[in-house]
Regions:
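Short, highly charged low-complexity linear segments
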Residues: 129-131, 210, 215-218, 242-243, ...
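Rossmann-fold NAD(P)H-dependent dehydrogenase/reductase core
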Residues: 1-186, 260-272
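Hydrophobic alpha-helix feature that most strongly marks membrane-spanning transmembrane helices
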Residues: 164, 189, 213-216
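Pocket-edge positions in alpha/beta enzyme catalytic cores
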Residues: 12, 41, 196, 242-245
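Short, solvent-exposed turn/loop segments enriched in Gly/Ser/Thr/Pro and often Arg
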Residues: 176-177, 223-229, 273-274
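C-terminal helical subdomain
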Residues: 148, 195-238, 245-255, 260
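Short glycine/proline- and charge-enriched loop/turn segments
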Residues: 130-139, 186-193, 232-240
Length: 274
């Protein structure tokens, strides 16, 4: 909503069109002048994702800010349309593919940014390249959630390194909302017990908005609440786990992700596309 209030053209790219329409109507009810529309986007389906990206690019001249904010958290065991574990497939691979498709459109903007949303749960994530989807193992929903958010953070950091190496004007940053009261945690017992003390959704979005817009955000790659346990408070520089900053593993993750989505995410080549 804050983007719309400030006069930005906002595209709500959502899988659930009922929720997207409700959000659009709430924004317009409070700010009739807002320029906002919806776009059907299912990050759990690579073909549908590509179609949505193509539709967006055909209807716009450029993209100033991409916020990779879709998320699935500790659901019952399930897979994406492409057979990936749902959390890794949606939270990481979906954003990986979407960013690749939209990169040429971002390069057309004057000061473009990408913000990939991670979580304080990334600290418990472990990459198991031999079995990232946990096939043949007892389903560990928290383990997969931690893995997906660790992958998000590593992807955002590695993307920025590759963009800088290619001489792009695009900046890739990361953020997390802390402990926010949103429906993302609806499968969590902790949410049902402690949601009354969680940050509001708007406060949880503050670090993401900061990373997307503020000049000062360029001084650090990862932003989140700066208060107790990094779960509450106003935006501050967020701590990254040692695993998140492992550049060799980030390169392995990139190669693995390319293999999973079925195409090369070659930054220089994508930036050269018109």
């Amino acid at each position: 909503m804050e983007f719309a209030v400030k006069g930005a053209e906002v595209v709500l790219a959502c899988r659930n069109q009922t929720k997207a329409t409700n959000a659009l109507e709430r924004i317009r009810a409070r700010h009739p002048e807002a320029i906002v529309r919806t776009l059907g986007l299912d990050l759990a389906n690579l073909n549908a994702l590509k179609q949505a990206a193509d539709e967006f690019m055909a209807s716009t001249s450029h993209l100033d800010v991409l916020i990779n904010n879709a998320g699935v958290m500790i659901p019952p065991k399930s897979t994406t349309a492409d057979g990936f574990e749902l959390q890794v497939g949606t939270n990481h691979l979906g954003h990986f593919a979407l960013t690749a498709h939209l990169l040429p459109h971002l390069e057309k903007a004057s000061e473009p940014r990408i913000v990939t949303v991670s979580s304080i749960a990334h600290t418990m994530g472990r990459l198991r390249f031999e079995n990232m989807h946990g096939e043949g193992r007892r389903y560990d929903k928290w383990g997969h959630y931690g893995r997906s958010t660790l992958a998000n953070l590593m992807f955002g950091l590695e993307l920025d390194r590759r963009l800088k190496s290619a001489g792009s004007r695009i900046v890739s940053l990361c953020g997390h909302p802390g402990y926010a009261n949103t429906s993302l945690q609806r499968h969590s017992l902790m949410w049902r017990l402690f949601n009354n003390v969680a940050l509001s959704a708007s406060r949880g979005a503050a670090p993401i908005l900061y990373a997307a817009t503020e000049p000062g955000a360029l001084n650090h790659p990862y932003w989140g609440p700066g208060g107790p346990l990094a779960a509450w408070g106003w935006p501050g520089q967020a701590r990254m786990s040692r695993a998140a900053t492992n550049k060799e593993d980030a390169r392995r993750l990139w190669a693995w992700s390319e293999e999973q989505v079925g195409f090369a995410f070659d930054v220089p080549s994508l930036l050269a596309l018109d």
